[in-house]
């Protein structure tokens, strides 16, 4: 089994899908990101990007066991799930975790999205095995030799465990989960649908400290956010960040790489290319996410050859992961 962790972006657009000539380079599908940790597949959100991802998982016979994490339950992060091919495969096992909604449980929201009034096939009629569970900020999600489960701490886990920590951000209407995925010393932070604060979001900076890759909401150009871009109303308070806000978090948290994410649906490829240039001037290792973008991370530590006890490795992992 490879010790590399791979990220692939299948949907990078916010709010609603935007097909067309103006979005060919970066793509128009709404959020969905695949993380491959060895032979384990973790999916972040189920916007329309999960539709081509599902077809690829089925084609490559990688749909046996999957972990799907919802950041929150707004439509652009759930709308692709009814069309997710592995959910219809009897031999597929889906672990679906995320926050409860403001007024409904996670499971009820997913069921409502596929009620008879809105979709011809119910959640129950999808043939896969599904474990649907709401999680809390204080918990961790673990995927190790024993399988996928929710735990109260990450103490005592093996080196092979994928550990996913949760940070709840209140900088988006209804709140949103930010996830930190760690495996073999490599860390990815997924911070979509969050809005920056004056002086940066210090809680998020602490949570994202030393992440190898920070995927951060950057829906707006600064002039759009402040109502200074012709044809675009001000968006302060909408729960999304500017390029500058994303770069401030990346710099303050000492992230290795910043990936701009959740692009505004009205932005053309040319606008996003300009946004990427702006980001690079503020945080050099920045890239604007596009469909098909792949990032590969190599293990930060060689546990097999390290002259440390299991307890010492656990401490080192906690300090550096």
Where is each model-derived feature located?
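Binuclear metal-dependent hydrolase catalytic cores
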Residues: 1-189, 195, 199, 269-320
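Cap/insert and terminal regions of metallo-dependent hydrolase folds
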Residues: 184-187, 195-291
């Amino acid at each position: 089994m490879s010790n590399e962790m791979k990220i692939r972006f299948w949907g990078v657009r916010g709010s609603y899908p935007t097909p067309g000539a103006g979005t060919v380079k970066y793509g128009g599908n709404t959020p969905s990101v695949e993380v491959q940790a060895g032979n384990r597949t973790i999916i972040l959100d189920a916007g329309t990007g999960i539709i081509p991802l599902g077809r690829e998982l089925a084609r490559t016979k990688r749909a046996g066991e999957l972990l799907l994490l919802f950041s929150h339950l707004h439509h652009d992060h759930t709308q692709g799930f009814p069309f997710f091919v592995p959910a219809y495969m009897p031999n597929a096992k889906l672990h679906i975790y995320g926050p409860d909604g403001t007024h409904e449980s996670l499971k009820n929201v997913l069921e409502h999205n596929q009620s008879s009034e809105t979709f011809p096939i119910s959640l129950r009629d999808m043939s896969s095995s599904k474990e649907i569970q709401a999680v809390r900020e204080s918990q961790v999600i673990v995927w190790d030799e024993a399988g996928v489960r929710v735990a109260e701490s990450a103490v005592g886990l093996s080196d092979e465990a994928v550990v996913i920590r949760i940070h709840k951000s209140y900088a988006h209407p209804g709140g949103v989960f930010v996830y930190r995925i760690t495996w073999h010393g490599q860390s990815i932070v997924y911070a979509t649908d969050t809005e920056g604060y004056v002086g940066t979001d210090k809680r998020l900076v602490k949570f994202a400290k030393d992440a190898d890759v920070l995927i951060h909401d950057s829906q707006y150009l600064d002039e759009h956010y402040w109502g200074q871009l012709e044809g675009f109303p001000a968006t302060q308070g909408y729960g999304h960040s500017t390029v500058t806000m994303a770069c401030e978090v990346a710099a303050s948290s000492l992230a290795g790489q910043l990936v701009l994410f959740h692009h505004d649906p009205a932005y053309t490829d040319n606008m996003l290319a300009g946004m990427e240039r702006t980001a690079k001037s503020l945080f050099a290792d920045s890239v604007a996410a596009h469909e098909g973008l792949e990032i590969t991370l190599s293990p930060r530590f060689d546990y097999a050859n390290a002259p440390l006890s299991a307890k010492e490795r656990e401490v080192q992992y906690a300090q550096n992961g």
